[in-house]
Amino acid sequence: MSRILKNIAVSLWLLFIASLICSSKVRNVKNLNLRSVQEIYANMFAADSRVLDDDIAGGFAYSMYPNLSKINFSFGLNDTQKPLDERNGKTNFNGRFDATSIVQLNPKIKLRGGATYSRSVKKSVKWNSTSDFEFLYPYFLADSVGGDRHYEYYSFNGAYAHTAGRLFYAFSGKYKASHEWGEVDPRPRNIVSDMSLSTSVGYKSRKHMFSLNMAYRVYNQDQNMRFVNPDGANAIEWHLTGIGSHYARFAGNGIYIFTRYEGRGYTANLLMQSLSKTGLNAGITYNNIAINRLLVNQNYTPATNLYKHRAETFVTYRRQSGGLIYGAEVAVAAGFHRGIENISDNGITDNFKVLARLPMYKENLFDGRVSGLVQMTWRRSAVYFSPGVEFNRKLETYKFPAKSMSIARGTGNLKCGFVFSIEKWLLHIEEKPVYSYCYKSKLVNNDELMEPVIRRCLDRQFQIEAMNFFANNIRLSVQRQFQKIGSLGLSLSWTHSRFLDGVKGENLYISTYLIF
């Protein structure tokens, strides 16, 4: 662990020094507050931020703020009464460090880099012993005892873009890793590595940039479960397979709980990006990934195979008339997941051959989002309102015993904010109330042999997914520009949540940052 932390610290420090050196050569700190305002406006719509995503190599090639670095320290406090979803637990405190930088070395070459490190403790985790369980769902390890989990996460990303007239090409890479462990039985120790490489080619017209982007992803997780005394362990680990089903053959706390997940996938998208703060942005994306769950002590026999596909498209449009800017966003996405359970032999010859592959699990997803924007600007200030409505629908089915779970919900929000700039100061205030209503939910469970403890877990999961909730987020940011070092800022974000069964939550995030 100490070696990992040392490597992280050295890498972050080198990134910081490199950013300072580059910035001292090519940057001017006069317009840092203006660039911060541009960043606020550029990410007003959720879909617009997609063109600047770390996984897209060329998204920053013609950004409105070509030279910008930011170092951010933040920590969060959570005062939720109890975990809403026991599988995630609750995080009372977490700390985070972020560093990002975009540097234009010359008129043709632009670089981007970033790093993140965070540390937290998840309290009272139950019915989940696997990291990234939402991504691996429904195939993850779980038990009814649980406990606290220590969690570390770090990531590094970098990109290179080269322009030649109206054409450009770019390459990028991103590496994410996490370490999650428990100190009381059951003691999971999960190590995750997630790497993606992408390339982009594009064309710049007078008002837009068009790009084709391709990315390849490699995901691995090694799960090592330990007990002080397995013979007297008070927990049974289940390899869940969907809607309360599990691999009865591999249940227990012995050799079957050592697991490895291997995922390989790719992403392809077409993007059209406006080169100004108004105009049209649009994109279409397809991604898929295949994830195998391997039993380590059974000669890496594949217990399950999960295939995930997702397609999405979005269009955003802005128009300006004097000091008035207005716009709209429409986004639609659909996904389908297919799960296969493998039947293997008894391993007498240590081969553990797969004898049959059974398609048992299906999940269909649909998401739609519509939002608008009205922004009124004056010389030193601006006010904006952005209402939005989102619809989500999913249907899970399990083949035998026949089970299904369907959820449909609508969510509305109203984001409103105020931006004020005077001399070297910048003030940003934003409020976003959200209300989500589940208008359709149904659970069909024909499994008469399901263990009572798992049945209670399934009922609780269904209750959570069908729950209505209200949340309100208020954010305040104050930024002050200095001539030699850049801009220093402080940001406070407070969220109040209230759920149907009386659970309340309070979250406070405090960030201090330097922009240069």
What are the language-model segments listed below?
Residues 93-115, 192-215, 308-329, 408-419:
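Transmembrane beta-barrel strand/turn architecture of Gram-negative outer membrane proteins
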Residues 116-154, 213, 220-223, 228, ...:
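Outer-membrane beta-barrel translocator/channel fold
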Residues 132-141, 239-515:
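Outer membrane beta-barrel transmembrane domains
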Residues 159-183, 192-198, 281-296, 384-392:
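Surface-exposed extracellular loop regions of Gram-negative outer-membrane beta-barrel proteins
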